[in-house]
Amino acid sequence: LRLALLGAAIAAVLALTFLLSGCLHGKAQPAEAVPAATAEERAAYLVGFGWQIAPEPVETLHLQLPEDLSAEWRDYLKLQQSQGLPFGDYAGCEAERYTYNILNYPGVERGVQANLFVADGIVIAGDVVSTGEQSFQQGLAFPESGG
């Protein structure tokens, strides 16, 4: 009976370790992982770039990232790599995308949004987009001059 209990305890610890490790496929989290488990952490991250945002996301999506990000997500993957975000480590994983309205994009009154992709409680990707007449997609850094 003790052996069975010990085996069950070991199995439980291994299962918990697997669940807590998330979907990093054996890769360690980056040294500068950005916490984003709460609304406050996500908002603080965007405000840290100089963005003024609406307090609540306008959209929250739960999605499954493709196993292969090099095809249709290639440009987005490059953008995230240039920002030092671990998007590529999360291929095939589940993530949430939080979309916020940006209120202070230079030269554009409305229609600009920030997206944050979050997995395992950290930011794995982010971008700023406008789909209006002046459509664009860029990294999270506040532009030095008007968009």
Segments (PLM) and residue ranges:
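A short, surface-exposed interaction/processing loop segment used at functional sites
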Residues: G111-G147
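Second-shell loop/turn segments in exported
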Residues: Q29-V34, I102-Y105, Q113-A114, V128-S130
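Mature extracytoplasmic domains of secretory-pathway proteins
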Residues: G48-E109
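Mobile, glycine- and charge-enriched loop segments
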Residues: Q29, P35, L61-H62, S145
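Stable alpha-helical elements in mature extracytoplasmic
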Residues: T38, R42-Y45
